[in-house]
Amino acid sequence: MEYSIDGMRRDDWAQVAAIYLAGIQTGRAAFRSEAPSWEVWDRAYAGTCRLVARSGSEVLGWAALTPVSNLCVLAGVAEVSIYLAPSHRGQGIGTALLNRLVLLSEERGYWTLQSEIMRENETCIRLHETCGFRRVGVRERLGRTCDDKWHDVILMELRSRTVST
């Protein structure tokens, strides 16, 4: 399948939200019950690091960064979110998206990317490891999903090799 990776646009939101919701519904991707509105999502995510993989007009997946803090000393640290449409998983799209997000983050001056991934989401953990992230810890029983099940979260990190720290 041919696809391109480019900046997310406002008119991508309906498809992005549907992909996000599909991930939420797995019970292994997020501690929330529904995708937020565009306005809420737009305020939370870094405007300069939002990508989609698309084939024609179809969004196949998305990746974006959330700043971890508004403190200037942490301005180069962000959390990764990456979600793929169920029908497009296992095709290398996630690897391409995450690698492109890493490059874009370095262009924008981020020196550390981190991800918090539910222990059960082994595919996402492997994706991050493939893209150079390392496990740095575990937060046990961090939160519960809508089914009232507690989940451990694996902390993963990637330090930039190009952004001076």
Predicted regions and their residues:
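Conserved acetyl-CoA-binding loop-helix of GNAT-fold acetyltransferases
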Residues: G90-L103, R126-T130
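Conserved catalytic-core motifs of GNAT/GCN5-like acyltransferases
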Residues: A64-P67, Q114-M118, E129, R134-H151
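A short beta-loop-alpha structural element at the N-terminal edge
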Residues: E2-V16
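Conserved beta-strand-loop-alpha-helix junction that forms the acyl-donor binding cleft
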Residues: R89, S115-I125
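Glycine-rich acetyl-CoA-binding "A-motif" of GNAT/NAT acetyltransferases
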Residues: E58-G61, T123, W150
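Helix-loop element at the rim of GNAT/NAT acetyltransferase active sites that forms part
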Residues: R10, A17-A35
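Acetyl-CoA-dependent GNAT
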Residues: A29-S87, L98-N99, L104, R159-R161
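Conserved GNAT acetyl-CoA-binding A-motif
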Residues: S105-I117
